[in-house]
Regions:
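Short amphipathic alpha-helical coupling elements at transmembrane boundaries
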Residues: 55-65, 78, 82, 116-126, ...
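Glycine-rich helix-loop "coupling/hinge" segments at transmembrane-helix boundaries
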Residues: 139, 214-251, 270-278
Length: 297
């Protein structure tokens, strides 16, 4: 008489939940209908879409060769660096103002009646694009880089504040409880237990936001908020495509350079912070081992 072993028994494949197929087809149908409704609302001309590749190719042919000399004479290089300055000032504004607010928004270091309005403040700022903020600031500061810097800085408060809040909420609560048990005040707990754990990550977020702000500052120039965008728009309006291509190429080179340098710095900051934590743990382990060895002698 043969006895079935565990290897002879093949488990049955579980059946999908009843109604899963109909639900998926229903979701797909809703998405398709939403896409068709969106296209109809845009009043898209399909004949124009068919001609678009040929027209785009004609414009690209007019952009070659780029007129770097004419662009340099008009000071476009200075406008590119002005975009970088706008992004840097905006990032500083966002970093300085978002950091203290992030401590008030974190649920592990702040009471609910404090963190709820701060979180809503972050959400409200992030809901307003930089372009709208720049339009608001232009009547106040006038045309120029200050409107762009303020718009980027205010918008960065919401994003950097959210990222910093999430970093604070993910820390180890042990040091906080230890300082609290010894009678340490809230400020002391933040200074000695929270900041050492999150500053490396928050600094990397600042650099990442700077990369985003460099690209945003180039766009803000198109509405007169400083930067290289105004130079690009003027060339496109007058159909000076060789000069426009030169501005685009220079802008892309500067942005890629900043992205590469910032990514390397962020990686070194994060790896260095992990290495410091690992070395401190090894030091504590070694001290424990040597203490045990001394006690056994």
């Amino acid at each position: 008489m043969a006895v079935a072993t565990s290897t002879d028994i093949t488990p049955e494949r579980p059946l999908p939940p009843r109604g899963t197929g109909r639900r998926r087809w229903g979701i797909a149908l809703v998405l398709i209908l939403a896409a068709l409704w969106s296209v109809s609302g845009l009043d898209v001309s399909f004949s124009r879409l068919v001609r678009a590749p040929g027209e785009a190719w004609a414009v690209l042919r007019q952009m070659v060769p780029p007129a770097f000399g004419r662009v340099y004479e008009r000071g476009a290089v200075g406008k590119i660096f002005e975009s970088v300055y706008i992004a840097w000032i905006g990032t500083l504004i966002g970093a300085i103002l978002s950091l203290p607010l992030a401590f008030l928004a974190a649920n592990n270091v702040s009471p609910r009646w404090v963190r709820t309005p701060v979180r809503q403040f972050f959400n409200g700022i992030r809901a307003v694009p930089e372009l709208i903020l720049a339009v608001i600031f232009i009547p106040i500061t006038g045309l120029g880089p200050w409107a762009g810097a303020l718009a980027i800085g205010i918008h960065s408060i919401g994003t950097l504040g959210k990222w910093a809040t999430e970093s604070i909420e993910s820390i180890d609560s042990g040091p906080i409880e230890a300082i609290k048990a010894t009678g340490g005040q809230w400020v002391n707990r933040m200074r000695w237990a929270v900041i050492p754990q999150v500053m490396a990550t928050i600094t990397s977020y600042w650099l990442f936001r700077f990369e985003i702000n460099v690209r945003a500052s180039a766009v803000l120039g198109m509405i007169g908020a400083g930067g290289v965008g105004s130079e690009l728009v003027s060339h496109l309006i007058f159909r000076d495509f060789p000069a426009a291509s030169a501005v685009l190429i220079l802008t892309v080179v500067v942005v890629l350079t900043i992205d590469t340098v910032s990514a390397n710095v962020r990686r070194r900051i994060i790896v260095g912070s992990v290495g410091d934590r690992d070395s401190s743990r090894w030091s504590e382990t070694w001290a424990d081992l040597t203490g045990l060895r001394r006690s056994t002698k």
